[in-house]
Amino acid sequence: MATPLQIMPLPVWPITFLEDAVVYLSALFTPWFTAFCVLWLHRYVRLIVHCYSHWTYKSKPIPSKPSYTSDDVTVVIPTIHDNFDELRPSLESILATKPHELIMVTTADKFEDLQRVAKTLSSPNIRIFCTQYANKRIQVCEALPKITTRITIMADDDVTWPSTMMPWILAPFEDPKIGGVGTCQRVKRVREGGLGLRIWNWLGAAYIERRNFEISATHNMDGGTSCMSGRTGAYRSEILRDYEFLEGFMKEEWWGKILKADDDNFVSRWLVSHKWKTWIQYEQECELETTLEDNIKFLYQCSRWARSNWRSNWTSLVKERHVWKQQWWCTYALHIATFTSLAFVFDFLILAALWWGTEGWEPVNRNRAIYAQLAFLAFSKVVKLVGLFRRHPADIMFLPVSIIFGYFHGLIKIYAGLTLNMTSWGSRTDGDTDDAHRLAPGPVRCSSLNTPRSEHKLPHYMQERDEIVNEKQQMREEEWEHL
């Protein structure tokens, strides 16, 4: 007789372990501790990823047989400087890289003065043009039709280039899918003068250093960035001379008005929308030097940049929406973060949620958790500035100022978000002379058109208008008959 099949009972310990784990996790993840975890992950996942991405970032190497040389480059500089003689060092550094041509565009009232300075530079490859209004988009559009080279570099009038700039900024264009290339940046440091002057100078240097960190990290993740800097950026001329680009560049809308600020943001979004890739050359040989305001006017610059970020990131996320598919990491780490990364709010909430979320813990463990969070918070305030401290160790004295300003900058972002209709510079002489043209109502189509007497048929749009009028008249007559 066959032995009946016996079913062995399952051991009790796995079930007991799971039950204990559920009980433990339920006790651990109180509402406040859950809130802490969510806030912490939202704020710091991108920082941890960016640290790894930045530290492993590699620039495109210079090819042994480059397809592009300096003779393929035209440099365009819009300028409204009040003293063109001060631009001489910057212009000489750019001309030292031997571009095919340097085109400068100023306003009509400053045209002769700029020509005078250009003649003293002893270079036959400089052309000067002028526009009626002091506006970068208008000035750039004045220069673009004159360009005959394959690459166009748009630069600010206060940047100083290293002599090694050109081969490095051209190297990424070996990839035919690359449409734009940016550079590493540094602020010209002030080592003499009062403490206030050096503090403002440090804040500007720290601002640019953080930007270097972010754009290299995001490019290493998905090739994206919120903005290719207008201080110096190289682009394929075929992109900038395209009729659709020029029309969009001059007719971008914001709140029903024509926006002629945020030019570099528009170019960056255009590259994304037309599936061109971008790259950043994070090398000392491709590192330009620039100047920022070293007084309270720096706050005006910060508010202007913050407004540009609000407007451009909102356009990217809501209106154009290309980044959702093409740059998934930048969508989270840059675009969405614009609306959620207020340090003075999130740092406080994370600490408060951790304190209340560990209320039932042993005092020793609770203190360890708080100290660990404070240590990580300090790390987050320092890690993006490591390059700055490495070059100038004495700058560590300014770290408390940087942390305090980081919290204050949250207020600047809120103010900028509430004043998005403002486009003024506020920090540059003559910079706001034509501010009314930066955000102005667009042209309105005339409601009636006068057509000369002719035996020819009316234009198509006139026919459509008459058909609509007749249709509305017929509807009114039918309504009256019904009544």
UniProtKB/Swiss-Prot annotation:
Glycosites: 313, 421
Q: Membrane spanning segments where?
A: 21-41, 336-356, 369-389, 396-416
Keyword annotations: Cell membrane, Glycoprotein, Glycosyltransferase, Membrane, Transferase, Transmembrane, Transmembrane helix, Virulence
InterPro entries for this protein = Glycosyltrans_GT2/GT47, Nucleotide-diphossugar_trans
**Primary location recorded for the protein, binned into one broad class:** membrane
Motif range for QxxxRW motif?
301-305
Going by the record, the broad EC class of this enzyme is transferase
Give GO terms: molecular function aspect only.
Answer: glycosyltransferase activity
Location of the motif Dxd motif: 156-158
| A cellular component term, taken from the record's GO annotations | plasma membrane
Knockout-associated phenotype: Results in impairment of vegetative growth, conidiation, stress response, hyphal appressorium-mediated penetration, and pathogenicity. Leads to altered glycoproteins during conidiation. Significantly reduces the expression levels of hydropgobin MPG1.
Topology in the membrane? Multi-pass membrane protein
Location(s), subcellular: Cell membrane
**In the Enzyme Commission scheme, what number(s) does this protein have?**
2.4.1.-
According to the UniProt entry, the note on domains is: The conserved DxD and QxxRW domains are necessary for the full function.
Give the UniProt family note: Belongs to the GT2 glycosyltransferase family.
Q: What does this protein do?
A: Glycosyltransferase that plays an important role in infection-related morphogenesis and pathogenesis. Involved in stress tolerance and hyphal hydrophobicity via its regulation of the expression of nydrophobin MPG1. May regulate growth, pathogenicity, and cell wall integrity (CWI) through glycosylation of heat shock protein SSB1, and other (unidentified) substrates may contribute to conidiation.
- Please give the name of this protein: Type 2 glycosyltransferase
Which organism does this record belong to?
A: Pyricularia oryzae (strain 70-15 / ATCC MYA-4617 / FGSC 8958)
Gene behind this chain?
GT2
